[in-house]
Amino acid sequence: MDIVSFAWAALMVVFTFSLSLVVWGRSGL
């Protein structure tokens, strides 16, 4: 795996995680 693929994978993980936190925060959990 090259560094570009790793960077994109990490970015997607961080984006998904923060989006989940926002959704959970808005629903009051």
Swiss-Prot record:
The 4 large subunits of the cytochrome b6-f complex are cytochrome b6, subunit IV (17 kDa polypeptide, PetD), cytochrome f and the Rieske protein, while the 4 small subunits are PetG, PetL, PetM and PetN. The complex functions as a dimer. It is a single-pass membrane protein. The keyword 4Fe-4S does not apply. GO terms for cellular component: chloroplast thylakoid membrane; cytochrome b6f complex. The chain crosses the membrane at residues 3-23. This is Cytochrome b6-f complex subunit 8. Signal peptide: none annotated. It comes from Phalaenopsis aphrodite subsp. formosana (Moth orchid). Component of the cytochrome b6-f complex, which mediates electron transfer between photosystem II (PSII) and photosystem I (PSI), cyclic electron flow around PSI, and state transitions. It is found in: Plastid, Chloroplast thylakoid membrane. One of its GO terms (molecular function) is electron transporter, transferring electrons within cytochrome b6/f complex of photosystem II activity. Belongs to the PetN family. Keywords: Chloroplast, Electron transport, Membrane, Photosynthesis, Plastid, Thylakoid, Transmembrane, Transmembrane helix, Transport.
